[in-house]
Amino acid sequence: MAKIKGQVKWFNESKGFGFITPSDGSKDVFVHFSSIQGNGFKTLTEGQNVEFEIQDGQKGPAAVNVFSL
């Protein structure tokens, strides 16, 4: 899978999910906290730059292997 760069559109810590806007202008991608790589509490902040891969999930495309940049 190709690595894609993008920016966090929004992320709800209490629900553990949000959306990332890819930098190539394609459709926003769902992200679940379990796909965030790193130690400690897994969360994202609005406007944060990230790198990720896209995988087809049960409800459409989802971001996986999400790394903060």
Curated annotation (Swiss-Prot):
InterPro entries, A to Z = Cold_shock_CspA, Cold_shock_domain, CSD, CSD_CS, CSP_DNA-bd, NA-bd_OB-fold
Enumerate the subcellular locations listed in this protein's record, separating them with semicolons.
Answer: Cytoplasm
**Pfam families reported in the protein's UniProt record:** CSD (PF00313)
Q: Where is the CSD domain?
A: 6-66
Traced from the root, the source organism's taxonomic lineage reads: Bacteria, Pseudomonadati, Pseudomonadota, Gammaproteobacteria, Enterobacterales
Q: Which gene name does the record give?
A: cspC
- Report the protein name in the record: Cold shock-like protein CspC
Q: Name one GO cellular component term.
A: cytosol
Q: Give the source species.
A: Buchnera aphidicola subsp. Acyrthosiphon pisum (strain APS) (Acyrthosiphon pisum symbiotic bacterium)
* GO molecular-function terms, A-Z: DNA binding
Q: Which residues form a coiled coil?
A: none
Keywords linked to the UniProt accession: Activator, Cytoplasm, DNA-binding, Transcription, Transcription regulation
**SUPFAM superfamilies documented for this protein:** Nucleic acid-binding proteins
